[in-house]
Regions:
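Conserved beta-strand segments that form the floor/walls of ligand-binding pockets within enzyme
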Residues: 66, 94, 105
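Generic beta-strand structural signal
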Residues: 63, 89-92, 102, 121
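Short acidic/polar capping segments at secondary-structure boundaries
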Residues: 26, 100-101, 110-111
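Regulatory modules associated with amino-acid/nitrogen control
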Residues: 1-85, 117, 121-127
Length: 127
């Protein structure tokens, strides 16, 4: 399997919401994602919910790009292809994966460049 088979013609949705990545010491019930590690918990929340998060550090201003396709576990290099393509246009990424797909977060001010680059790879980007 080649990542380009999934990218070419694959749909990518752009979130209406803007997210913040927060370092905290507990879960948040409305979090899009929670990652627990020894010594810290990271939650990704909509910026409108920031007041409810007791965070020691906050990185606001992230838009979520969701690859609306089921990505098989044996697919090698998909995220590498996406991250490399976005790095070529100087777009930093924050990545989360679910069981079936990937979510790539980009800074709000870099969204236009990210969308253009994904479209150049053959993705259909939907708002």
């Amino acid at each position: 399997m080649n990542p380009s088979e999934f990218l070419d013609g694959g749909t990518v949705s752009v979130s209406d919401e803007t997210y913040a990545v927060c370092r905290t010491d507990r879960d948040h019930p409305a979090a899009f994602a929670t990652v627990r590690e020894a010594g810290e918990t990271t939650v990704v929340v909509e910026e409108g919910d920031l007041d409810e998060v007791d965070a020691s550090d906050v990185e606001p201003g992230w838009k979520r790009l969701t690859f609306e396709m089921e990505l098989p576990f044996e697919l090698v290099g998909f995220l590498a292809a996406v991250a490399t393509a976005l790095a070529e246009v100087d777009v930093s990424v924050f990545v989360l994966s679910s069981y079936a797909t990937d979510h790539v977060f980009v800074a709000e001010q870099a969204l236009g460049a990210a969308v253009e680059r994904l479209e150049a790879l053959g993705c259909v980007v939907a708002d």
